[in-house]
């Protein structure tokens, strides 16, 4: 069983960007081309994040040090109502595909704006994961969002928004390169819906929720042609210098369907913001019991009927949850601003901007069956308080973490920012 740990950490992140961030994509860089006659705009930009961290605890073997945690090159093209964006990362010395999509705004009126989007980008079901890392007011996102919310996927969405309402929903594939070992891809349906009873130049009050259904199909051949699916759930310790997930991680074999709900709130004034989410995920499992039962017949200790085999190899749903609340106070600089197109708080990028931030987050990846015991020597659970070979325990222990973060952020200008956290 994973132990509770204490992790005092001092972290500093420096951000350099050739971009003045507009909305949640980088679309107003220094290097750009504008052709007003043909309503054409093109741009190229980039950014780099460098982190330094010192971890002090006797219980947690993590590596203090420094790292280039993110480096990106991006390009965008706007032609009339069509917007195309590509973003590629080189953080930690590795190439990675970030955002790559096309977006078309097909109707604008006083009642609202309608648009469609297709490509590879964040699924719209989480306030935290939808916020660009440059616009985030902390060095890292909370662990619960990393573990239970989706990141980027290949798909298509339809969005509508105005001053008081926001709706963003779509369908996505399980894997962007169809790289499952066997079987065909699964899919997910994701959406985020918001109501803003107050939304003016000074104050925004927002309530909403994200919903996601996921179907997992592709997997590996287990035995006798049976596909075994798996869901890996993991998060780092809210730091990028050492991104180990060994303290918060679990595998859910035979995962088939998953449902996630993420209610959220946001309050923003000129000098203060508060926001938070609660995330609840349930994972249902499925396997071909009949085939697996038949494959063990004839053994020296084989089960004689499928009901007995099921009782010795129990399968039940797994529930995981967590949440976070974040607060910020702007000591110097212009007012906090809000982005209607994404339903998100914008980042601090004014010259001389200084803010104080705080966050509490909890992540629970543990779902233990009542009565189960954990034997440290074997590193496994046993049901009903008895150390026996059968039945197997269906308990999951991916770890539980509570975290408190205090931060101070300073913006030299819209291109350079330094962030410190404890």
Q: Predicted regions span which residues?
A:
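Bacterial N-terminal signal peptides that target proteins for export
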Residues: 1-8
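Bacterial N-terminal signal peptides
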Residues: 8-15
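Sec/Tat signal peptide C-region and signal peptidase I cleavage site
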Residues: 18-23
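Surface-exposed, low-hydrophobicity segments enriched in Gly/Pro/acidic/Ser residues
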Residues: 24-28, 34, 189-190, 216-252
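Outer membrane beta-barrel
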Residues: 31-56, 60-201, 205-217, 319-320, ...
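Outer-membrane beta-barrel pore domains
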Residues: 59-60, 228, 232-422
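Short aromatic-enriched loop/helix-cap "lid" or pocket-rim segments at secondary-structure transitions
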Residues: 129-132, 219-224, 289, 370-371
